[in-house]
């Protein structure tokens, strides 16, 4: 389960792994919880 304070770190970690996100991924992918 995610918490609001985890999002900045989570988004940074995902961006390092995936590289530049497509807009769909940025808008919906990490919100799938």
Swiss-Prot record:
Keywords from the named record: Amidation, Cleavage on pair of basic residues, Hormone, Pyrrolidone carboxylic acid, Secreted, Sulfation
Posttranslational modification: Sulfation enhances proteolytic processing, and blocks peptide degradation. Levels of sulfation differ between proteolytically-cleaved gastrins and between tissues.
Primary localization class, coarse: secreted
Keyword Secreted found: yes
Location of the protein in the cell: Secreted
Residues with Sulfotyrosine modification: 28
UniProt keyword annotation of Membrane present: no
Domain of life: Eukaryota
GO molecular function: hormone activity
Modified residues annotated as Pyrrolidone carboxylic acid in this record: 1
Protein name, UniProt field: Gastrin
Organism: Macropus giganteus
């Amino acid at each position: 389960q995610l918490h609001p304070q985890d999002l900045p770190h989570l988004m940074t970690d995902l961006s390092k792994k995936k590289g530049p996100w497509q807009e769909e991924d940025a808008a919906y992918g990490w919100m799938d919880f």
